[in-house]
Regions:
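Buried hydrophobic residues that stabilize the cores of well-folded domains
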Residues: 1-101
Length: 101
């Protein structure tokens, strides 16, 4: 699978910004939404890109303006998480999930 195929762009989803996330399950659950205008008040924040069904396609942890880590997600047609492509500390991991009916 070509990793470039996973990367959503602004045209494939809407971006929103958050202070943190909760839980340990994937996809991450971003919490405490903030406005784009307030980003300069935060050293660290999470940028999430969401599709029309509000599924997160991409989650980036931004620290001092630089992307420190990111999660790229793909879903089965029924909305269940299919793949998590995680890039952190220059290490890439893929986690495949079974489709649950």
């Amino acid at each position: 699978m070509n990793p470039e195929q996973l990367i959503p762009t602004q045209s494939t989803g809407t971006s929103r910004y958050f202070v943190s996330y909760s839980g340990i399950k994937l996809p991450l659950k971003l919490i405490n939404e903030i406005t784009e205008a307030s980003l300069n008040n935060w050293n660290t924040y999470y940028r999430g890109y969401f599709d029309a069904e509000n599924r997160m396609l991409l989650c980036q942890k931004v620290v001092y303006g630089e992307v420190e880590s990111e999660h790229q997600y793909q879903y089965y047609d029924n909305g269940v998480l299919k793949l998590a492509h995680i890039i952190e500390d220059d290490e890439v991991r893929e986690i495949h999930f079974n489709e649950m009916v």
